[in-house]
């Protein structure tokens, strides 16, 4: 596989099980927003990773998460990569870590989750992408980083 020595991917130090970027230099640094970025472009690109619908359901009503969305909206290229699919949202809470006896008590429905995700795109300008798995999300993150790195590099050369 090709190595991209000019691109150093920043992994937030709080990321507990980070993606492996074997073809890139990786630096672990505390990011103000998001879980991943590109060294030297930390104010331009950020990727927030969400592992499960349960994680989204837990975050969705928290003021702290709204603050994250507002910070993400300040980036030129803000992304939320979802390590699950649309079908997982539509079936929620099936497949979640919530005990079955609690399902009737939850107030967060698939419709509520989807409404909020659409708002993240429309209100905040954040690219929200269903990736179906962690592996797919990592692969997509690599493509995003390459594309944005070279797009920004070309833009600087034209200045």
Regions found by a protein language model. Name each.
Residues 27-33, 37-159:
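Extended, alpha-helix-rich binding/interface surfaces that flank or overlap catalytic cores
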């Amino acid at each position: 596989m090709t190595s991209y020595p000019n691109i150093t991917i920043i992994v937030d130090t709080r990321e507990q099980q980070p993606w492996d970027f074997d073809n890139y230099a990786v630096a672990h640094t505390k990011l103000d927003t998001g879980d991943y970025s590109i060294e030297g472009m930390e104010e331009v690109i950020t990727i927030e990773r969400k592992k499960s619908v349960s994680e989204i359901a837990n975050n969705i009503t928290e003021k702290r998460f709204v603050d994250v969305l507002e910070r993400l909206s300040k980036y030129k290229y803000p992304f939320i990569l979802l390590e699950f699919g649309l079908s997982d949202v539509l079936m929620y809470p099936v497949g979640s870590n919530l005990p079955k006896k609690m399902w009737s008590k939850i107030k967060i429905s698939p419709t509520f989750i989807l409404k909020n995700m659409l708002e993240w795109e429309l209100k905040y300008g954040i690219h929200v992408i269903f990736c179906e798995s962690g592996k797919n999300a990592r692969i997509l993150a690599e493509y995003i980083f390459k594309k944005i790195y070279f797009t920004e590099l070309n833009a600087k050369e034209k200045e």
